[in-house]
């Protein structure tokens, strides 16, 4: 599971997910990319599930880059616990996703296979996505 090795603070405030992705919004490493078109949170488990799905589809050919990292801790209180008595303990880690954010990149496979792999991976994610190709500058 992806999570930071160490953080400055154990727990963070909720915050608001607004705006568009200013960084990581282009295909930088691979030839094809999976880009988010809606906003939301992706957990470390979802990132890993999508990665496994893509890896299985492309078999041994090609390379995959994960362009998101879950760096925000989400806390929760146990069931049937009264309110108050402090913030709950960290349950899992998420990556805040904004529209336009590149989630995964891939190279070394045919476009058809890349599309299939990204479609399978997108089914595992809670945000809407689209397939993009690298633009030649």
From Swiss-Prot:
A single GO cellular-component term on record: cytosolic large ribosomal subunit
UniProt cross-references to InterPro entries, sorted A to Z: Ribosomal_uL16, Ribosomal_uL16_bact-type, Ribosomal_uL16_CS, Ribosomal_uL16_dom, Ribosomal_uL16_sf
A Pfam family this chain is assigned to: Ribosomal_L16
GO BP term, pick one: translation
Key words, A-Z: Ribonucleoprotein, Ribosomal protein, RNA-binding, rRNA-binding, tRNA-binding
GO molecular function: rRNA binding; structural constituent of ribosome; tRNA binding
Family from the record: Belongs to the universal ribosomal protein uL16 family.
Oligomeric form and interacting partners: Part of the 50S ribosomal subunit.
HAMAP family: Ribosomal_uL16
Role description: Binds 23S rRNA and is also seen to make contacts with the A and possibly P site tRNAs.
Name recorded for this polypeptide: Large ribosomal subunit protein uL16
Origin species: Marinobacter nauticus (strain ATCC 700491 / DSM 11845 / VT8) (Marinobacter aquaeolei)
């Amino acid at each position: 599971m992806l999570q930071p090795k160490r953080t400055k603070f154990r727990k963070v405030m909720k915050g608001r997910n607004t705006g568009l992705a200013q960084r990581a919004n282009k295909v930088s490493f691979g030839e094809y990319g999976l880009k988010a078109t809606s906003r939301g949170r992706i957990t470390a488990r979802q990132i890993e599930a999508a990665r496994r799905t893509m890896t299985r589809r492309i078999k041994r050919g090609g390379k995959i880059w994960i362009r998101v990292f879950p760096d925000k801790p989400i806390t929760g209180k146990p069931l049937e616990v009264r309110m108050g008595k402090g913030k709950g303990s960290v349950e899992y880690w998420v990556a805040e996703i904004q529209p336009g954010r590149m989630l995964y990149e891939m190279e070394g496979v045919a476009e058809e296979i890349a599309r299939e792999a990204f479609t399978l991976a997108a089914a595992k994610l809670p945000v809407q996505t689209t397939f993009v190709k690298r633009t030649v500058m």
